[in-house]
């Protein structure tokens, strides 16, 4: 029984569960999507909140440039490149034996400075927001001061009396541990069994305490939350419920708008933008999608991509039960090579906030992630970790879907021909060479 209902009855009410349970790659295009002007109210946050987050990151830019010299060229702003991947697009046409109209671009959060993943957005932002609250409250800086002062010894000594804790499959912990340690905080990262060893090693090299679990992500988060509870000197970064994380990710959208403008890419009803976002617990893709809907309204179509073994957000939103159900409830094992997406229970906050704003959800099996990883490297010379390829099949899923989604959304052949598809590459820039070689060898063996 699952929430008092037999699995057989769940399958009658929600027939797409059969494919999820059988681990078959599948998709579901959301029939409940609503106009963004109406559905954005579900989130409980607005454009002013995102603007406030953007301004905070600007205040911290001098400090980031001082602590991380690799960001000096961008003035301490942590941002990634947007690149067209036309050769990969051609390779996908051959791979899927389909026309795949439109243009294909890659957002390279995989190569963001500091931690090499999308988590350098939300994770670093939340730690900075917490540091600012402490610094303002204790008179270390004023809002108009040069925040690079927070790197001075007295400020570091102050932060050293405070702790930052987080539960993670890897990349969020990497971001929070590195920025926390750089500011002087005591940092502890509770890591699930899925976390890669090199990520644990890197954190320890930065002086971060790594607590390892033999169980999955949800247990690591719960243990981290429990350890932090009741300690006024510990700030727990709650990936399942944090609005600060969400806003840190949302800032990406206005910056993307500037990059699209610079590339001469129009986004409107006749030139739709499809953004394919890998999804774990949901905070990163949810925050980015929220920002995109604020920036582009109904001209942007956001889709979440998950591993077949960890389809937690698909399951939660499709059934309407959100965090009340886990993939394990239905016999899905939550074991995937896409370690950054190995989450069995979704964020209820994100699922409810975004359920009328997202166009759809789809799953990808691990072998396909490795094929696409090798195909991207072969065609464009770009190397990503498996999780980051989850969005790559999206252009084919949209083009070939049989559920009437394109007709419902007014996505005519002419509009699809004018479309821009953006694959959000979430991580991989810091994967050790030996590990990347193993990824590529597996992918090439599956392709050839």
Swiss-Prot record:
The catalytic activity of this protein is classed by the Enzyme Commission as 4.3.1.18
> What is the enzyme's main class?
lyase
What GO biological process term is on the record, naming one? D-serine catabolic process
User: Which key words tag this protein in UniProt?
Assistant: Lyase, Pyridoxal phosphate
- Annotated Gene3D superfamilies: 3.40.50.1100
Tell me where in this chain the PTM N6-(pyridoxal phosphate)lysine is found: 119
In the UniProt record, does the keyword GTP-binding occur?
A: no
| Catalytic activity from the UniProt record | D-serine = pyruvate + NH4(+)
Question: At the top level of its lineage, which domain of life is listed?
Answer: Bacteria
Q: Which cofactor does it need?
A: pyridoxal 5'-phosphate
Q: Name one Pfam family in it.
A: PALP
Q: Which GO terms describe its molecular function?
A: D-serine ammonia-lyase activity; hydro-lyase activity; pyridoxal phosphate binding
Q: Which family does it belong to?
A: Belongs to the serine/threonine dehydratase family. DsdA subfamily.
HAMAP family assigned to the protein according to its UniProt record, in alphabetical order: D_Ser_dehydrat
Q: Which PANTHER family does the entry mention? A: D-SERINE DEHYDRATASE, THREONINE DEHYDRATASE, MITOCHONDRIAL-RELATED
Q: What is this protein called?
A: Probable D-serine dehydratase
- Organism of origin is Pseudomonas aeruginosa (strain LESB58)
């Amino acid at each position: 029984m699952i929430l008092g209902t037999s699995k057989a009855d769940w399958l009658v009410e929600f027939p797409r569960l059969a494919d999820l349970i059988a681990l078959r790659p599948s998709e579901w295009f959301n029939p409940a999507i609503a106009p963004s002007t109406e559905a954005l109210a579900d989130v409980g946050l607005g454009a002013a909140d995102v603007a406030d987050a953007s301004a905070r990151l600007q205040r911290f830019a001098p400090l980031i440039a001082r602590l991380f010299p690799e960001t000096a060229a961008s003035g301490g702003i942590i941002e990634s490149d947007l690149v067209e991947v036309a050769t990969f697009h051609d390779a996908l046409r051959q791979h899927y034996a389909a026309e795949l109209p439109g243009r294909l671009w890659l957002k390279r959060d995989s190569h963001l400075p500091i931690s090499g993943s999308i988590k350098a957005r939300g994770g670093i932002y939340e730690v900075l927001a917490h540091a600012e609250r402490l610094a303002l409250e204790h008179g270390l800086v004023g809002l108009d001061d040069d925040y690079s002062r927070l790197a001075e010894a007295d400020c570091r000594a102050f932060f050293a009396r405070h702790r930052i804790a987080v539960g993670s499959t890897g990349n969020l912990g990497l971001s929070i541990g590195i920025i926390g340690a750089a500011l002087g905080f005591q940092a502890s990262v509770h890591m699930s069994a899925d976390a890669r060893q090199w990520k644990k090693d890197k954190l320890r090299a930065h002086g971060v305490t790594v607590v390892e679990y033999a169980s999955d992500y949800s247990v690591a988060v719960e243990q981290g939350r429990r350890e932090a509870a009741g300690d006024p000197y510990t700030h727990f970064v709650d990936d399942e419920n944090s609005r600060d994380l969400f806003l840190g990710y949302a800032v990406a959208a206005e910056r993307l708008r500037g990059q699209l403008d610079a590339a001469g890419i129009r986004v409107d009803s006749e030139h739709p933008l499809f953004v394919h976002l890998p999804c774990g617990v949901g905070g990163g893709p949810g925050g980015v999608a929220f920002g995109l809907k604020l920036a582009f309204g109904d001209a942007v179509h956001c889709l979440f991509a998950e591993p077949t073994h960890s389809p937690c957000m698909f399951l939660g939103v499709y059934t309407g039960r959100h965090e009340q159900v886990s993939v394990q409830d239905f016999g899905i094992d939550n074991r995937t090579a896409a370690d950054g997406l190995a989450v069995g229970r979704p964020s209820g906050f994100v699922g409810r906030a975004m359920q009328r704003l997202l166009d759809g959800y789809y799953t990808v099996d691990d072998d396909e992630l490795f094929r696409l990883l090798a195909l991207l490297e072969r065609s464009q010379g770009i190397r990503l970790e498996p999780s980051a390829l989850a969005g790559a099949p999206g252009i084919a899923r949209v083009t070939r879907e049989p559920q009437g989604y394109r007709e419902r959304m007014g996505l005519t052949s002419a509009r699809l021909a004018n479309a821009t598809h953006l694959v959000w590459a979430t991580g991989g820039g810091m994967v050790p060479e030996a590990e990347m070689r193993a990824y590529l060898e597996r992918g090439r063996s599956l392709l050839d």
